[in-house]
Each structure stands twice: as structure tokens, then as C-alpha cells.
Curated annotation (Swiss-Prot):
One of its GO terms (biological process) is adenine catabolic process. It comes from Jannaschia sp. (strain CCS1). Its EC number is 3.5.4.2. Its cofactor is Mn(2+). It catalyses: adenine + H2O + H(+) = hypoxanthine + NH4(+). This is Adenine deaminase 1. SUPFAM superfamilies: Composite domain of metallo-dependent hydrolases (SSF51338), Metallo-dependent hydrolases (SSF51556). GO terms for molecular function: adenine deaminase activity. Belongs to the metallo-dependent hydrolases superfamily. Adenine deaminase family. CDD domains: AdeC (cd01295). Keywords: Hydrolase, Manganese.
């Protein structure tokens, strides 16, 4: 299926001018609304907007001269009209949905623009996978822009991916329609140390006049941070404190503050605006990672904006951070992010700016959602057969594959420590018993990274603490940021083998086993990352998974996200990869048993 290009301003400029002047009728006129102008931080009561060919032609006190015989007229007295919301940084794959189904889920929440970084699928299928995501994105009735992933692998030499991304791939992608920049530059040590590959990717992006996304996951705000800023990233979403936000803005970067399914970083950073008084133009609200369950039950960008307001932010400033600031950051302020002539007619009808109930959503001048229901088709790509067969284990796994052996009576082990509601882990040590030559978890859990891209049969084993799991369980997932092999966590090695083999059977997803039976299964057949079923169906299965995790003893908030991040070898302190245990503080492999 080929996308239908949305007309450019140049294509329709004459019609927009004629409509605004009253020489040609508008397609749609909305009258008497409280129009929110984020460009001036004003609310204009009783204003009208006139729309032609999906763009705003006239925005002002009286659009009666734009009304013709066939013009659709809607009265909105007493209601606010605000720009459609923009998510400045996010990964569609985190919703475990295809671009089409993710779009269908967020439209009723008022999201009309998304800036996506498909680096999850890049690790599985490389540039081809990115293009497939991008092609489906271009089919959607809202604006789904793509940032070309920068880091596959995220940490060269510390993990192996299905495919790698390099400067030539970045240069090629910069010529695709709808590409807005380079995705988050996670290899911050590479930038700081002058990696020629990383700098070449950044240079290719800047040469194309596009935006470089950042990712500085370190508390060090000394010379390393300044070197990273000098390397070209234009934004960063990894801050967790007011100090982090201020440091980024002072270095000319935009601070992206996030509220996702597992990230709660708005409250701790927005005080840089609300209390310290820094210029809010340099702060952007984003979600980063949102599960289908969150989208179905809680919302998307509307949830994040409401949270910012609840944290003391002026509603108009919060809206700026989710509209015009984002558009300006990506050089699209002439296209999206404000209700003004020439821009795409993306807008939301709401009766209250603080609680932000989303009543009606328009995208490109068309009503796309009303009272929580998506009214438009979100077309699917015909995904190639091989993308649905991406789990290649190479052999039948048994309990013996998950053994960590020692000749001692007890050992001191390096242990990954999970921290609730935070991406960073703690590097812990724990004394563990050895029985019959096998190290036993003894109150914690085992973790394994099972290679699934090349069918090597490789299994890397270690230990993890903090989930609270009881005996006889295992959970496996092919969503294993960022290399997306397979993470298996369990307290029973036989269950770990069963869980891993089950995902090989279904082509990927998440499964939880307890006492010999499967208690939950979320099938993710596309790249082992996504389902092309509706968000409501995926969310229902995720709910079953969460209930099964709780029954197995885990009560952490959003524990699944913590599970999926245990192989993300660019976020401190301790992670696992197919090459071994990784100390992210030093970016070196470290033994499980020192």
C-alpha cells in the first residue's frame, strides 16, 4: 500500500490565501471557540478558525467571510481549541504494537504528531527493519515522523545485535521522506571519546539539516558531559533531576522530560521552569516508552501534560512543551505545533485546560476521534514473512543450559540490583550456596540472555535481585533492550528452559511459567517485538502477565519494563549481554563470580 502524500504548503498556498481573503470557501469553519495560541501563550475567546485542504487558512475573530455554500460549520462556544499534541521522543515498539495499532490507540488521546526512534527493530532487522516501520508510519492519518536509529549495537564490543547500523545507513536514511533526524545517541562514551563512527553519523545528520537526538545516561556533569554536548546532540531525555534539566538547557540542548509507563521524570525536573524560572522554550514533554496497557487505561501525551500541570506548571506552558516547543526543535514550526495559518489543522476540543478531557480530535482538518473512539482507518503494512519468524534459538534448551557452576562450597557473586521506577540498576554482591557443583540463587533469581538472532545456541547466565519472585517460576521475553535477544529470569532452571522454548514456538513475545504450567503469554510475532492486534487485546494479555508476575511474588511497579531493560548495556550500573555481565560504569565485561 502506497501512502497518499499530504499536500505541502506550496501545493495549496493559493487556495489558503484565497480562503483567508474570502475569495474561496473554506472546507471547515469552527466558530466561537476559546482558541489557545501557544505561539503567544494566549487564549482568544470567541475566535474562529477556517480550514482548507487540511491546513489552517484563517485564525481570527470572525471567519464568516470564509464560509461558502458547501462549508461545514461547527459551533464550539465554551470549548477550548488547542493544538494537537506532539510526542517529542518515543519508541513505538515499546507499546508492543505496530505503528498502525499504536496510532489507533493514541489518536483518541489527542496525539497528532509523534517523533519515533525505531531502534528496537533496527537491532533485529537493521536498516530494512527501520524502513518497514517508516513505511507503515507514512500510511497513518496523523504525523508519524522517524528518527534514524544511531546505535545498533548500543555499545559496540559489549553486545551482538542481529544487524548493525553505520554512517552509510544514516546517510541513506536522511534522504527518505519523513525522516527528521538521528535517534538518541546512546553511545555517549563513544561520543565523549571521539569515536569516528559516532561523529560520522552525527555529521551526516547535520549535513542533511536535521536534528540529532541525545541520550546521556550518566550523573557525571563534568568534562564528559560537556564533551558530549560538544559532540552535537540537540536534546536529552535521560535527566532525572532539576540539576540535570538545567545543565542540559544551559549547554544549548533541549531538556526532554518524560512520563511513560515506567519513567516518572517530569516532577523532578519541571521545577527548573516553575521554581528556577528558566526559559520554558527549551523544555519538551515526551513519553519515551508507553505500554499498550498505559495507552488503553491512562492515555498518552494528554496524561503527560496533565501530570506536568499537576506538578505546578502553568497549563499554557505545559501545552507549549507538548506542541510548539517540539515542532520548533525539529524545524517543523511552519507545519505543526500551533493553530496558525499555513500549519496542518491538527487540533483538540476540550472543555478544561487543567484536566484536559479530550472530546474531539482533528488531524489535517479531518475529525479523527470523538469521545475516546478513533473514527479513521489506520492502515497496516503487509509485513514480510521473515519478520514473523525472528526467534532462532539453534537448539533445544534444557535446565543444564542455565547452570552456573563452581567447585567451591559457596561463592560471592556480582548481582544486578533492580531499582523500582528507575532505569539504572545497582551493582550488588551476594554470597550464594553451591549444591552439587551448581550455584543456587538462594532468595534472589537467575537471569539469562539467550541468543536468538543467529541461532548460535548461546546462553549467558548471571543473577538478579529485587523482583521478589518465589520458587518454581520463570519469565522469558524477546523484548530485551536494546539488542533484543531473549531475557529469561527465574528461580527454577527447568521453568527457564520451558519459557525460552515456548517463545521459540510462537515466534516471540513474553511468557511466564509457574510450577510447570504457562500462566501468561503475550504473542509478539513481528520481530519478536510487536503485535498487529489492537491495543485493547494486547493490553488484556499484558494485564494477565502482570497478574501472573504478582502471583509469582513480584509487586514492583511496572516490573515488566525493568525486566526488559536488564540487557540495556548503556544505562548503569550492571547489565547482561550475550557476551557476559557488563559493568556500565567502566563499559567493561565483569565476571559473575569474581
Amino acid at each position: 500500500m502506497e501512502p497518499t502524500p499530504f499536500p505541502s504548503w506550496q501545493d495549496v498556498a493559493s487556495a489558503l490565501v484565497a480562503t483567508a481573503a474570502g475569495r474561496a470557501p473554506a472546507d471547515l469553519v469552527i466558530r466561537g471557540a476559546k482558541v489557545v495560541l501557544v505561539q503567544t501563550r494566549e487564549v482568544m475567546d470567541g475566535w474562529d478558525v477556517a480550514i482548507k485542504h487540511g491546513r489552517f487558512a484563517y485564525v481570527g475573530p470572525d471567519a464568516s467571510h470564509c464560509i461558502g455554500e458547501d462549508t461545514q460549520v461547527e459551533e464550539l462556544s465554551g470549548h477550548y481549541l488547542i493544538p494537537g499534541l506532539c510526542d517529542g521522543h518515543m519508541h513505538i515498539e515499546s507499546g508492543m504494537l505496530t505503528p498502525a495499532e499504536f496510532t489507533r490507540a493514541v489518536i483518541p488521546h489527542g496525539t497528532t504528531s509523534m517523533f519515533t526512534d525505531p531502534h528496537e527493530i533496527a537491532n533485529v532487522f537493521g536498516l530494512r527493519g527501520v524502513r518497514l516501520m517508516h513505511d507503515e508510519a507514512l500510511l497513518q492519518p496523523i504525523n508519524v515522523f522517524t528518527q534514524m536509529p544511531s546505535c545498533a549495537p548500543s555499545a559496540p564490543g559489549l553486545e551482538t545485535t542481529g544487524f548493525e547500523i553505520g554512517p552509510d545507513d544514516v546517510s541513506e536514511a536522511m534522504a527518505w521522506p519523513g525522516i527528521v533526524g538521528l535517534g538518541e545517541m546512546m553511545n555517549f562514551p563513544g561520543v565523549v571519546n571521539g569515536s569516528q563512527q559516532m561523529l560520522a553519523e552525527i555529521a551526516a545528520t547535520q549535513a542533511a539539516g536535521k536534528t540529532v537526538g541525545g541520550h546521556y545516561a550518566s550523573p557525571d556533569l563534568g568534562p564528559a558531559f560537556h564533551a558530549y554536548a560538544a559532540g552535537g546532540p540537540a536534546d536529552d531525555h535521560e535527566g532525572t533531576s532539576e540539576t540535570d534539566a538545567m545543565a542540559r538547557m544551559r549547554q544549548g540542548m533541549r531538556s526532554m522530560i518524560r512520563l511513560g509507563s515506567a519513567w516518572y521524570d517530569i516532577e523532578s525536573q519541571i521545577t527548573a521552569i516553575t521554581e528556577r524560572g528558566l526559559d520554558p522554550r527549551n523544555m519538551i514533554i515526551c513519553t519515551d516508552d508507553c505500554f499498550a496497557k498505559t495507552l488503553v487505561e491512562d492515555g498518552h501525551m494528554n496524561r503527560a501534560v496533565r501530570h506536568a500541570i499537576d506538578c505546578g506548571c502553568d497549563p499554557l506552558i505545559a501545552l507549549q512543551m507538548a506542541t510548539i516547543n517540539t515542532a520548533t526543535h525539529f524545524g517543523l514550526e511552519r507545519e505543526i505545533g500551533q493553530i496558525a495559518p499555513g500549519r496542518r489543522a491538527d487540533m483538540i476540543v476540550t472543555r478544561d485546560l487543567r484536566t484536559l478531557p479530550i472530546e474531539v480530535v482533528y488531524a489535517r482538518g479531518q475529525r479523527v476521534a470523538q469521545f475516546g473512539e478513533c473514527l479513521v482507518e489506520c492502515p497496516h503494512l503487509d509485513w514480510p514473512t521473515d519478520t514473523r519468524h525472528s526467534v532462532n534459538l539453534g537448539k533445544s534448551l534444557t535446565a543444564a543450559d542455565f547452570e552456573i557452576r563452581s567447585d567451591a562450597a559457596e561463592v560471592t557473586a556480582n548481582v544486578i540490583g533492580v531499582v523500582e521506577n528507575q532505569a539504572p540498576t545497582k551493582a550488588l554482591t551476594q554470597t550464594l550456596p553451591v549444591r552439587h557443583g551448581v550455584v543456587e540463587p538462594d532468595g534472589i533469581a537467575q537471569i539469562a540472555l539467550v541468543e536468538r538472532h543467529r541461532g548460535t545456541g548461546g546462553v549467558t547466565n548471571a543473577f538478579v535481585s529485587g523482583f521478589g519472585y518465589g520458587p518454581g517460576m520463570a519469565m522469558a521475553s524477546t523484548v530485551a533492550h536494546d539488542s533484543h535477544h531473549m531475557i529469561v529470569v527465574g528461580t527454577d532452571r527447568a521453568m527457564m528452559a520451558k519459557a525460552a522454548m515456548r517463545l521459540g514456538e510462537v515466534g516471540g513475545g513474553i511468557t511466564l511459567w509457574q510450577d510447570g504450567t504457562e500462566r501468561a503469554l503475550v504473542e509478539l510475532p513481528i520481530a519478536g517485538l510487536m503485535s498487529d492486534r489492537p491495543a485493547t487485546e494486547v493490553a488484556a494479555k499484558v494485564t494477565q502477565l502482570v497478574e501472573a508476575m504478582e502471583a509469582a511474588g513480584c509487586t514492583l511497579n511496572n516490573a515488566y519494563m525493568q525486566h526488559s531493560l536488564l540487557a540495556l548495556v548503556v544505562i548503569p550500573e550492571l547489565r547482561i549481554s550475550d557476551l557476559g555481565l557488563v559493568d556500565v560504569r567502566t563499559f567493561e565485561l565483569t565476571p559473575v563470580l569474581p
